[in-house]
UniProtKB/Swiss-Prot annotation:
<dbReference type="InterPro" id="IPR000537">
    <property type="entry name" value="UbiA_prenyltransferase"/>
</dbReference>
<keyword id="KW-0350">Heme biosynthesis</keyword>
<feature type="transmembrane region" description="Helical">
    <location>
        <begin position="227"/>
        <end position="247"/>
    </location>
</feature>
<dbReference type="InterPro" id="IPR044878">
    <property type="entry name" value="UbiA_sf"/>
</dbReference>
<feature type="transmembrane region" description="Helical">
    <location>
        <begin position="110"/>
        <end position="130"/>
    </location>
</feature>
<dbReference type="Pfam" id="PF01040">
    <property type="entry name" value="UbiA"/>
</dbReference>
<comment type="similarity">
    <text>Belongs to the UbiA prenyltransferase family. Protoheme IX farnesyltransferase subfamily.</text>
</comment>
<keyword id="KW-1133">Transmembrane helix</keyword>
<comment type="function">
    <text>Converts heme B (protoheme IX) to heme O by substitution of the vinyl group on carbon 2 of heme B porphyrin ring with a hydroxyethyl farnesyl side group.</text>
</comment>
<protein>
    <recommendedName>
        <fullName>Protoheme IX farnesyltransferase</fullName>
        <ecNumber>2.5.1.141</ecNumber>
    </recommendedName>
</protein>
<keyword id="KW-0812">Transmembrane</keyword>
<feature type="transmembrane region" description="Helical">
    <location>
        <begin position="185"/>
        <end position="205"/>
    </location>
</feature>
<keyword id="KW-0808">Transferase</keyword>
<feature type="transmembrane region" description="Helical">
    <location>
        <begin position="131"/>
        <end position="151"/>
    </location>
</feature>
<keyword id="KW-1003">Cell membrane</keyword>
<dbReference type="InterPro" id="IPR006369">
    <property type="entry name" value="Protohaem_IX_farnesylTrfase"/>
</dbReference>
<feature type="transmembrane region" description="Helical">
    <location>
        <begin position="38"/>
        <end position="58"/>
    </location>
</feature>
Length: 305
């Protein structure tokens, strides 16, 4: 590991990409993750307004505090993750140009900045409801400590543990409005929790060699592709009943969710027939991204009519 890390460091420092401070900042906070969670947080909040009958425009203070606060804690958690993972990020093609790896942002700076963002975000969430702030803290702790610092490097169940943190944004949005969690909020949480596992296992198949080089015990690294495929199918199938608990949004959402789930399951089953595993995992990964966007945006749109 030490020799490979030394070689990687030499290669990286010899070919450091010229980037702006802004680009390094966006890489540090993993802006793609922040953006995707923005959608799910907003959906949870929007549906809370819809089901309670509260005015969206009449509560723009809650909207701004929730969206900015949740984005800050996610960005801060990602910065902490980048700082902690710099020793393994240097070994993977996908992550070797992150600013914490190239030295453009020092670990201490990343930790301090990440903690600052988390604290500011939690304060903003606390200005909405205590419940929202508590859930936000649970998300941060799960991602930064239970996932990043503990399970990621030791257990194949790391994906499941990390999925808890990725599932709390809809709960943050919902509880910022209501202060309580009801069935619809839990369904959004479960959709996000279950969705992440086949999503990230598909990515793990695509990046198996990267994870193997870094010594990260992802499921396909430890148990191979066939076991991973079966796990993907099982978790995808677990999504099937969830749309039926969203009947309050009308049958079109139930139908859309069911079709999306069946489509994903069919593509998953194709993995046992397709010879090109990488092509299949890419198809699964791309479908998962479209699944999330279509389903959550549709939940918002349906309430406008």
């Amino acid at each position: 590991m030490a020799n490979s890390k030394t070689a990687a460091e030499a290669a990286i420092h010899g070919q450091i990409e010229k980037t702006t401070a802004w680009k390094d900042f966006l890489a540090l906070i993993k802006m793609g993750i922040v953006n995707s969670n923005f959608i799910t947080t907003f959906t949870g909040m929007w549906l809370a307004f819809y089901f309670t009958g509260m005015s969206f425009l009449g509560n723009l203070d809650i909207v701004l505090l929730t969206m900015i606060g949740s984005s800050l804690i996610i960005a801060g958690s990602c910065a902490i993750n980048n700082a902690f993972d710099r020793d393994i990020d240097i070994l993977m093609e996908r992550t070797k140009t992150r600013p914490t790896v190239t030295g453009k942002i020092q670990p201490g700076q990343a930790y301090a900045f990440g903690i600052l963002l988390v604290v500011l975000g939690l304060i903003m969430l606390l200005m909405t409801t205590v419940t929202s702030a508590v859930i936000g803290f649970i998300g941060v702790f799960t991602y930064a400590v239970l996932y990043t610092m503990w399970s990621k490097r030791h257990y194949t169940i790391n994906t499941v543990i990390g999925s808890v943190s990725g599932a709390v944004p809809p709960l943050i949005g919902w509880t910022a409005v209501t202060g309580t969690i009801d069935t619809t909020a839990w369904v959004l949480f479960m959709i996000m929790f279950i969705w992440q596992i086949p999503h990230f296992l598909s990515l793990a198949i695509k990046k198996t060699e990267d994870y193997r080089k870094a010594g990260i015990p992802m499921l396909p690294v430890v148990y191979g592709f066939e076991v991973t495929k079966r796990q993907i199918i099982i978790w995808t199938a677990c999504l099937l009943p969830l749309p039926f608990f969203l009947g309050g949004l009308g049958w079109p959402i139930v139908a859309l969710g069911t079709l999306l789930n069946i489509g994903w399951l069919v593509i998953g089953l194709m993995g046992f027939k397709m010879k090109d595993v990488m092509k299949w995992s890419t198809l699964m990964f791309v479908y998962s991204l479209n699944y999330l966007t279509i389903f959550f945006v549709a939940m918002i749109i349906i309430t406008l009519f």
